[in-house]
């Protein structure tokens, strides 16, 4: 008789183990009300969906070793081609050699937007093997920016390709250029 009462009580109470792991029910509230009946003294509470874990589940590398961090840059500096700028706090190399880092050599062209667009089209037609990617024409935005110069950024596979580009291509006198490195990974 005690077993029958236990089975009857168990069949009318929500069959979720309190000590077990919570899972999210995919049934609607109408389906849940027909599938599980609750007594007036108990509250029917559905477990919330589990949030997925973001990022790696364990730290990559040795967390105590800061030397394993690639390209930890100083946010105040923009160009590592300047010999006086140390772009990496953990790097003793203050020169132009950026082989320690996954930095992409770039040439930044500055001038009138129409001149830059025409020049970029000529580069794609005649010198497409001398650079990797060319950006669209863009501007820096700031409330007090009085300069109306446009910019185009050219990226290269390595510094040798950039040197070959600068030796081969004649940059028009209305366009100025600056050398640098971009520490973003490109597609």
From Swiss-Prot:
Its main location: host cell. Signal peptide: none annotated. InterPro entries: E2/EBNA1_C_sf, Nucleotide-bd_a/b_plait_sf, Papillomavirus_E2_C. It is found in: Host nucleus. Belongs to the papillomaviridae E8^E2C protein family. It comes from the Viruses. This is Protein E8^E2C. Keywords: Host nucleus. Gene3D superfamilies: 3.30.70.330. GO terms for cellular component: host cell nucleus. One of its GO terms (biological process) is regulation of DNA replication. Plays a role in limiting the replication of viral DNA in keratinocytes. Recruits the host NCoR/SMRT complex to viral replication foci to mediate repression of both viral replication and transcription. GO terms for molecular function: DNA binding; DNA-binding transcription factor activity.
């Amino acid at each position: 008789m005690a077993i029958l009462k236990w089975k009857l009580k168990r069949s009318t109470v929500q069959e979720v183990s309190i000590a077990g792991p919570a899972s999210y029910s995919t049934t609607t509230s109408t389906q849940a009300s027909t599938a599980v009946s609750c007594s007036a003294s108990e509250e029917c509470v559905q477990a919330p969906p589990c949030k997925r874990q973001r990022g790696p589940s364990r730290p990559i590398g040795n967390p105590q070793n800061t030397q394993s961090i690639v390209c930890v840059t100083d946010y105040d500096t923009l160009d590592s081609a300047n010999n006086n700028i140390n772009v990496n706090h953990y790097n003793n190399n203050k020169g132009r050699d950026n082989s320690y880092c996954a930095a992409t050599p770039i040439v930044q062209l500055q001038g009138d937007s129409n001149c830059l667009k025409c020049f970029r089209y000529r580069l794609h037609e005649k010198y497409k093997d001398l650079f990797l990617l060319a950006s669209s024409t863009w501007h820096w935005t700031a409330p007090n920016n009085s300069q109306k110069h446009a910019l185009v950024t050219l990226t290269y596979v390595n510094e040798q390709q950039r040197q070959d580009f600068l030796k081969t291509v004649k940059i028009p006198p209305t366009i100025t250029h600056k050398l640098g490195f971009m520490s973003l990974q490109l597609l």
